[in-house]
Regions:
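A generic secondary-structure signal marking the coil-to-beta-strand transition
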Residues: 8, 16, 41, 75, ...
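Charged, gly/pro-rich active-site loop segments
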Residues: 2-3, 75-133
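Short, surface-exposed beta-strand-loop junctions and turns on beta-sheet-rich folds
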Residues: 51-53, 72
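Short beta-strand segments
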Residues: 15-49, 57, 63-67, 76-78
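Extreme N-terminal tail/first-helix region
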Residues: 1-17
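Short secondary-structure boundary/capping segments
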Residues: 9-10, 35, 55, 110-112
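Short secondary-structure boundary segments
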Residues: 48, 69-70, 124-125
Length: 133
């Protein structure tokens, strides 16, 4: 396990889009934009059950999440590790992310296939952090 530097945590706590990369069954990479939160050193992502990233992680738990500071392209963090999928508390997690990213108390798109949620908890195994120019 790797720990996140405080400066990297500060960046990851900002409501900025991040990119999550998972491994498809054929070995190719799947990249998608996500919202992130932190729980200690764990990176928290939330998705709808059945999405490609959730299916990919059930088959191969390796994942990498990157975030770039839009004000400084040389200020970024990448956290790579192993994901655990958690359904308990997933609705509260997406609501907390919606509060941070959208400024609303509840996630407004929870309908149809977006209804069932899963939290992706990423335990860092490798952290790359660039403090900026």
């Amino acid at each position: 396990m790797s720990t996140l530097p405080d400066e990297a945590k500060e960046l990851l706590r900002r409501p900025l889009p991040a990119w999550a990369t998972t491994v498809r069954p054929d070995g190719s990479l799947h990249n998608t934009v996500v919202w992130v939160d932190l729980d200690g050193d764990d990176v928290i992502v939330n998705t709808a059950v059945g999405r490609a990233k959730e299916q990919n992680l059930r088959a191969d738990a390796r994942v990498s999440v990157s975030m770039l500071d839009p004000e400084d392209a040389f200020h970024w963090v990448t956290v790579s590790g192993t994901a655990r999928l958690e359904t308990e508390g997933a609705d509260a997690a997406i609501d907390a992310l919606a509060k941070e990213y959208l400024g609303v108390d509840t996630y407004p798109y929870r309908e149809g296939e977006e209804r069932r949620r899963v939290t992706i908890r990423i335990t860092p195994e490798r952290v790359l952090y660039k403090p900026g120019a």
